[in-house]
C-alpha cells in the first residue's frame, strides 16, 4: 500500500495476519509504485491472487448488484442525485449504472481531491494540471482506472484538503458522525454542486470511510498542525486532551 495510507489501515491488515508492503508515492508506471510492486509479488508467489480492483469489472458489478439497489430501495426511488468520490471507481460506477437504469434523470456527481487527474479527464479529456499530492486517502487518482466510467457521470467537483479535513472534524463535532476525509470530500462536493441548482433535490452522499481509520491524522492535532491543516491558535477543545482524575475533579469543582 502507498506510504500515505494511515497507520490504522496498516495495523488492521497486520491484525488479519497480512504482511504489509509499503510503497513510495511515485508515478503509476514506476517499478516501485503499488500497482507494479503488487504485480511483481503475484508473479513470484505460487497461488497468489491480484484482486486488481482498479480494473477488475467485478468491482463495478458488486455495487451494481448490491449498493445501487439498496440506495434505490431505501429512497423508494426518490433520488435526484448521487454524490461520492472515485478511487477504484467501483462504487460510483456500479451505483450509477443501476440508478440510471431505473431513472435516467438521476445525476451522478464525483467529488475529486485537488491534485487528482480525474476532474481534468472528465472536463478537458486530457490532463491539464499534473498530478499533485493530497492528504485525503482512498479517492482521486494519478491514472485513469478502468472502473472509473467517466461517460456515465454527470459532473465533477474539486475539493481541497483544507475543506475536507475541516468538514471531517465538523461532522463528528456537530453531527456525531465519525467519518473520514473522503466522506467529508463527498459531502462538500454535494454542497458545492447543489449551489448551482434552484429547486430542492433528494441527494444521496456516499460516506465510504470510517473516522476510526484516521485517528492518527484527521483527529490528531499534532498531525494536523504539521501538515498545515490546523493552526496552533485554533486548538481549543482538543481531540487529544487527556487529563487525570485529579485534574478533572479540580477543574469541574470550580464550576
Where are these regions (language model features)?
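Active-site/ligand-binding-proximal alpha/beta "capping" segment
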Residues: 45-86, 94-97, 150, 154, ...
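Active-site/ligand-binding loops adjacent to catalytic centers
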Residues: 34-36, 47, 101-181, 218-255
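Residues that mark the start of a beta-strand
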Residues: 105, 201-202
